[in-house]
Amino acid sequence: MTLSRRQAIGAALAAPVAVKAAAAAASPPALPDKASFAPTLVAYLDSASIHPMSLGARRAMDAYAAGRTLDPAAPPPVDRAATIASFARLVNADPDEVTWVQSTTMGEQAVLRALGFPGTGGRIVTDTLHFYAAFPMYQELAIQGVDVTWVQAHDGRILLEDMARAITPGTRLVSLSLVSTYNGFQHDLKAVCALAHAVGALVYADIIHAAGAVPVDLHDSGVDFAACATYKWLMGDFGLGFLYARRGVLDDLRLADFGYYGFAAPGAAPGIGLSPPQTHVYPMDPPGQAPTSYIHRAGALGHFGTGTYAQAVIPAIDHGLDYIAAIGVPAIQAHAQQMIGALREGLIAKGYRLITPADARTPLLTALLPDARERLAAPLARAQVRLSLHDHHFRIAPSVFTDMRDVERLLGALPRA
């Protein structure tokens, strides 16, 4: 049978939907899973920087592009509310506690604005294993009068007793990374939240290195706010992520973001889709005392919803969340730990000093090395091994596709420390 061009395109674009349905019913892929990703000559051990896009995510984005080019054979768009719900299930949150955000940093900024920083002043506690690119943000807040306290790391850890000493009465916010981008250290988030709440402080957690990589339970932790982008362990892409706000925490906070996704027409049904306010200024509009009538949407969307967002990324995120759910985070974590264990043993044998805590269960492993970038760039390039090189340390981050051959290739390429 010969297919017409339109039939062939339609069949190709329908494939992601069929694959998704089949995947839900079939056995999850075994790990390591190289088949779900494009073939490469590179031993890729840098998923903590950027996770490779899976073939399924690429097909899902291709299907979205077909719709945007008005292809009549394009499948229906991804249900965005269902994608929000999938993320909420992953981190044990309710869907209305979650909304879209451009990036992790934009989520953190939104929380700071909602709390009135810097204008209202007050005390913020953060630590030196938080995301290093957020450091200038807190330094600038300090310049503008906010009392910012830094908890220092010791041997690659932030000690709970040091957090307890820093979180004093009058603290308004504790801001941290659940899993540190520097070395994979993981906070006891529930314990930190208990310390903060005991003095009336709220807690924000950057979960970009936790969601999809280690079990996360936002409700159980008691954390007030959390945010993450999706281009790392959620296997999405740049430009869109999630912002979480615990139910009830927004009730006493002023509205600081005024975007049209946060408002809806009076009487509009619940949902996350666009609901333009009722106008009173155009011909044949109903009369009104103000230019528009609107209601505030409930939950995180009503407080943080702004304008349009990167909709082309949603199909990739949706596919990534389905993939993670099919395998299960515990299985993903266990596979990563198998790779990390072999890497840890091999690095120590070569004389490298590790700064990742020995009991960490995250998929990041960091070693200290003076002039690491200068010394390792050439041998790693020759061996076609990719990891995260910095001035005086390097970070390795295996994922679902990593196998022992990748590990052995890296260890073989590294000179003795």
What name fits each language-model region?
Residues R6:
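Residues within the helices of the helix-turn-helix
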Residues M1-L3:
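N-terminal secretory signal peptides
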